[in-house]
């Protein structure tokens, strides 16, 4: 079946690879930055118009909420590889069957996550040693979030379909609308109606539903070839198993990264408020650089998956080389900017008078020296995901985060915050060594899995 490409979707199997990478990555970068704003809106509004206890509860709830959301987003990342591969083959019937399979698997897994969250919320808050005075607020917020998980999944599923077709702009526009809607609803429910933390949670839940509906309507209107119909309602066991495997591995990938960061935070928390503040400021600055690298990885994955699906093996190899050159260059550029402007960016967050300023600058400068490995690693993860070998990015990331956690805890008593930067860099180097070894092995056998 020949695909009639819409104005916003892209046939990525032809044309300039560099141009495709840039056109895919730029909206993804802005999307990641918008996501950072989206994640802080509730805290900002509650901090301004509710009590200190409710503000603290947002922080605790965010730790739990992000773990569940990372599981959903990670799963949809795996589904998007299957979508892009079918799109590259111009087989819309297969794509819609993959979509149905992802919908069934994803909704079942989301329902399980929702039930686990609702049933295990109180024990989890106890494990996190949530203070009694904010536990009720935290539980109230999380209850709304868990109930809105199906809407969050549907939005991410529809957005992954758009990205798989090369239409990354639409997903960005929907996210921008969601950020605006969440901000307005937060002010209405929290400031206007004095709803407190429950009002903020309701605003977030309604925004998730709004995002899913808008994304679905856009798909039906502009990408009818991606929309399910009654004739597509057939499932096979092999397809369900493939969908589950891709979704589960990429979900574990995202969750392992987040859990690793939480464990590193545990090591930092032993050093007192000043060091915690320094680490928080440093990682906030890192977040902007990481948004570029992760967007490059997603763009590489989409571009690779379409061409791999179309059988363009020579072009897949060119995509890897082009992405590696681009991301190494951007990694060097980001490292230079982070190193030179570390004092200025940290000063914006902490000022320059407190005890946290010096450790934050030293941390940011040390970790920046390794950023070329971070960015190069994004090429490998995008490439391997796009060719269907989703286990390799997971294994590399799991190894990286394990090294990062172990070395951070071992070296922190001697090196302080610099131990975390050094452990992070060593983890990136080891992950790249693993992926490079697998790439050399691939070249020797000249084989795609």
Predicted regions located by residue number:
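Small-residue-rich hydrophobic transmembrane alpha-helices
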Residues: 55-115, 152-171, 278-342, 374-396
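Transmembrane helical elements of multi-pass membrane transporters/channels
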Residues: 23-42, 144, 178, 207-211, ...
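Short runs within selected transmembrane alpha-helices of multi-pass transporters and secretion channels
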Residues: 76, 145-163, 174-179, 200-215, ...
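Residue-level signal for short hydrophobic patches within transmembrane helices
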Residues: 14, 18-37, 41, 64-71, ...
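Helix-terminus/linker motif at the lipid-water interface of multi-pass membrane proteins
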Residues: 33, 37-56, 125-132, 188-195, ...
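Transmembrane alpha-helix boundary and packing residues in multipass membrane permease domains
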Residues: 28, 32, 44, 81, ...
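Hydrophobic transmembrane alpha-helices of multi-pass small-molecule transporters
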Residues: 67-70, 182-186, 212-216, 288-291, ...
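Short alpha-helical transmembrane segments in multi-pass integral membrane proteins
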Residues: 1-25, 83-148, 192-248, 304-370, ...
